[in-house]
Amino acid sequence: MSPPAAIYEPTVAATGLKGKVVVSETAPVEGASQTKLLDHFGGKWDEFKFAPIRESQVSRAMTRRYFEDLDKYAESDVVIVGAGSCGLSTAYVLAKARPDLKIAIVEASVSPGGGAWLGGQLFSAMVMRRPAEVFLNELGVPYEEDANPNYVVVKHASLFTSTLMSKVLSFPNVKLFNATAVEDLITRPTENGNPQIAGVVVNWTLVTLHHDDHSCMDPNTINAPVIISTTGHDGPFGAFCAKRLVSMGSVDKLGGMRGLDMNSAEDAIVKNTREVTKGLIIGGMELSEIDGFNRMGPTFGAMVLSGVKAAEEALKVFDERQRECAE
């Protein structure tokens, strides 16, 4: 568990602004050296030399581990599509609650994190409405409190995202496949005619982007009884699973995301995060494309708490979906 948060009163900045800052209790131990790396390397650069290596050793070290992961996670317990703030939050809660589950995260971009590296309009600060600060406390991410008690501010959105990512990828039961796109869903027939989702069809993102100008490049697959899609609003890879449900006939049409209304949007996204068809849970902004909710703009509380709700929904149905997909 992350250490508890501590609150301290900072000095007034040059701007004249002053606010309560919440930080995790990770201060250095008194008396410990704060120059360990300098003590180790400093003043010794003339004789510095890396350990010798053969180029093939590098190739084999990378390849062996990656293909071991491909083999291991070809049959996963949960696949999370999209590694933005919602997907990573889902992975964190799931991996911590169920260390026995194999959780694969598939992210189309080289760099996970989605839009959570910045706040609105490419600004560095990130705003979260209460009670989402509970999630920040869990991670140990510091934040500032303004006079208005209804929200908190993370000074650098990148600190939140990098902290969350580092914790998620530290779990031994999580594997991130970045630069990998989901091209389709694996389905199974059901009695009511709506397909049950039983996995994802994947390919290198660079291959996916060039299907129109190259010959056939078939994909790969990952089986899993529960898929959690958090691919964001409509875009080249956004709202992928939502759009695929329409083309498969499982959903008549998309609701279409409506104009910006923070107050209605965030509550709606969190409350309605759910299993939309057997084996497929949708959360985050992708849900607005299904249900026609408003967009929320540059506030991130709903993303992380939708992730918490998605994890809860997955835990509710996992055992049943696993039995159904056992064949």
Curated annotation (Swiss-Prot):
Name the catalysed reactions: [ADP-thiazole synthase]-L-cysteine + glycine + NAD(+) = [ADP-thiazole synthase]-dehydroalanine + ADP-5-ethyl-4-methylthiazole-2-carboxylate + nicotinamide + 3 H2O + 2 H(+)
The alphabetical list of record keywords is:
Cytoplasm, Iron, Metal-binding, NAD, Nucleus, Thiamine biosynthesis, Transferase
Cofactor(s) for this protein?
A: Fe cation
What does the UniProt PTM comment say about this protein?
During the catalytic reaction, a sulfide is transferred from Cys-216 to a reaction intermediate, generating a dehydroalanine residue.
**Residues that bear 2,3-didehydroalanine (Cys):** 216
Q: Where in the cell is it found?
A: Cytoplasm; Nucleus
Q: Record's InterPro entries?
A: FAD/NAD-bd_sf, Sti35, Thi4_fam
Q: Cite the binding residues for substrate.
A: 86, 107-108, 115, 182, 218, 233, 285, 295-297
Q: What is its EC number?
A: 2.4.2.60
Question: What Gene3D superfamilies does the entry give?
Answer: 6.10.250.2840, FAD/NAD(P)-binding domain (3.50.50.60)
- The yes or no answer to whether the keyword NAD is present is yes
Coarse class of the protein's main subcellular location: cytoplasm
Q: Where are the transmembrane segments?
A: none
Please describe what this protein does: Involved in biosynthesis of the thiamine precursor thiazole. Catalyzes the conversion of NAD and glycine to adenosine diphosphate 5-(2-hydroxyethyl)-4-methylthiazole-2-carboxylic acid (ADT), an adenylated thiazole intermediate. The reaction includes an iron-dependent sulfide transfer from a conserved cysteine residue of the protein to a thiazole intermediate. The enzyme can only undergo a single turnover, which suggests it is a suicide enzyme. May have additional roles in adaptation to various stress conditions and in DNA damage tolerance.
Sorted alphabetically, which HAMAP family does this protein's record hold? THI4
- What family does the entry list? Belongs to the THI4 family.
Assembly and oligomerization: Homooctamer.
Q: What is this protein called?
A: Thiamine thiazole synthase
Organism, scientific name: Aspergillus oryzae (strain ATCC 42149 / RIB 40) (Yellow koji mold)
